[in-house]
Amino acid sequence: MSVYTSVSDDEMRGFLSGYDLGEFVSLQGIAQGITNSNYFLTTTSGRYVLTVFEVLKQEELPFFLELNRHLSMKGVAVAAPVARKDGRLDSVLAGKPACLVACLKGSDTALPTAEQCFHTGAMLAKMHLAAADFPLEMENPRYDAWWTEACARLLPVLSQDDAALLRAEIDALKDNLGNHLPSGIIHADLFKDNVLLDGGQVSGFIDFYYACRGNFMYDLAIAVNDWARTADNKLDEALKKAFIGGYEGVRPLSAEEKAYFPTAQRAGCIRFWVSRLLDFHFPQAGEMTFIKDPNAFRNLLLSLG
């Protein structure tokens, strides 16, 4: 999360007039993350997370917010959206789309245990199953067409080796995207900083704003690539096993899915290597922003062999 759009106290008071959340107390920017402007909002009725969307359009928000409400009602640990007085889940602040969600207890972790990986994997499988009857649709905006287009933009600024690696991996994935595998609504960004933990248990998944339709192996691979990734950008096999074991305890994988998993891991590496390269070479101006190391997923990709 980051802060690109600054919000004054007076703007917040006007914004809150559309909600039954009491009086404004304070607003604190959240520096982590890279896409939207995020704040902790405190009112006389409690604490919430405010998100001002820098890229998503107003008409796209209902998918993400209704998905969170749907999952919350199905017992998945998520940050439920807060409705306005008029019943809408989305709003406008500083001329941009915005929303409020519940502020969950717990915190993220940079060094997960096997127990935390197991329970996070189980909750991811529960999420996949719970979203099976969700009626709204969203295609993946950051999949093959996106990374192919981004590659063309990035090649002039990359080293010769990185450019060759990126081209080769994207070419290899063209006819191997796993579209034949079980699919549904996926989180598509379930990194460690998007899961709140209370001890060994999951208190909530957050930041669903890349959620879309996709194959479940791709979603699982994205999560494992981060949760089991070590400081030197290799995979800890014990953490990987724990995460997948938790997932399979809720939703067993087919032999075909297991066979595809290594390819899904490579696709996950490409997706986040490309997005971080774009953020690094073409940064978005902001008051309090956080750009992540683009080489982490290149190095993980290389370690996969």
From Swiss-Prot:
Enzyme class: transferase
Catalysed transformations (reactions): L-homoserine + ATP = O-phospho-L-homoserine + ADP + H(+)
Family matches, as Gene3D superfamilies: 3.90.1200.10, Phosphorylase Kinase, domain 1
Pathway where it operates: Amino-acid biosynthesis; L-threonine biosynthesis; L-threonine from L-aspartate: step 4/5
Coiled coil: none
Similarity comment: family membership: Belongs to the pseudomonas-type ThrB family.
Protein name as it appears in the record: Homoserine kinase
Source taxonomy: Bacteria, Pseudomonadati, Pseudomonadota, Betaproteobacteria, Neisseriales
Gene symbol of the encoding locus: thrB
